[in-house]
């Protein structure tokens, strides 16, 4: 067990580098809202600050990760997505495999869906939203049928299959995802 001051993390210290070389059972970050983009003015305003950068690197080195904050959004909605990115690193069931499908990882694109202000235009687009990350079958809705059709266990959270490769039953199940508020309820 180690209790480490975030002051060591904010400054690029030798201790910080040492911590990045270890593996962890559980990491708990208090005041997680401090892990965010630099902000302010200038070309570097959208870059991660040292704490966010550290957490993005160390997240995959831990089995469990807990972020504590009373105020996940200090000034910008993007700060909430920064915290979600930390939780997603090495896991891919929070925001999905963002390199292959950036919809949930892009706060500007995902926010209208999360708020219920956006619904997919058709089943093909619904599949693009749902396939990565694909919720477990226990979530109900179309997910049990989709997982059964794709032969995906609940511990795999994405499908790389295109809409055209889905059978009729799976494509029909996606109609539920076009209902108002579906993405808000299942995100």
What are these regions (language model features)?
Residues 63, 78-79:
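Conserved catalytic segment of ABC-fold P-loop ATPases
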Residues 2-24, 41-63, 67-70, 91-187:
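Inter-lobe coupling linker of SF2 helicases/translocases
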Residues 80-94:
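A short helix-turn-beta junction within AAA+ P-loop NTPase domains corresponding to the substrate/partner-engaging
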Residues 74, 81-84, 185:
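Short, hydrophobic, well-ordered secondary-structure elements
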Residues 9, 34-35:
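A short, flexible beta-alpha/helix-coil linker loop
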Residues 35-38, 42-44, 74-76:
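Catalytic P-loop NTPase motifs of RecA-like helicase/translocase cores
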Residues 30-31:
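Walker B catalytic acidic pair
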């Amino acid at each position: 067990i180690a209790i480490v001051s975030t002051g060591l993390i904010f400054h690029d210290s030798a201790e910080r580098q040492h911590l990045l070389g270890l593996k962890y059972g559980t990491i708990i970050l208090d005041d997680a809202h401090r892990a965010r983009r630099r902000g302010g003015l200038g070309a570097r305003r959208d870059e991660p600050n040292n704490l966010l950068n550290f957490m993005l690197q160390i997240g995959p080195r831990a089995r469990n990760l807990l972020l504590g904050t009373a105020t996940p959004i200090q000034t910008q909605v993007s700060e909430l997505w920064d915290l979600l990115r930390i939780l997603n690193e090495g896991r891919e069931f929070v925001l999905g495999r963002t390199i292959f499908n950036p919809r949930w990882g892009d706060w500007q694109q995902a926010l209208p869906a999360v708020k219920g202000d956006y619904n997919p235009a058709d089943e093909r687009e619904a599949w693009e939203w749902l396939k990565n990350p694909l919720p477990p079958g226990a979530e109900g809705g179309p997910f049990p049928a989709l997982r059964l059709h794709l032969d995906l266990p609940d511990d795999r959270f994405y499908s790389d299959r295109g809409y055209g490769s889905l059978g009729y039953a799976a494509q029909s199940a996606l109609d539920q995802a076009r209902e108002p508020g579906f993405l808000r309820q299942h995100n």
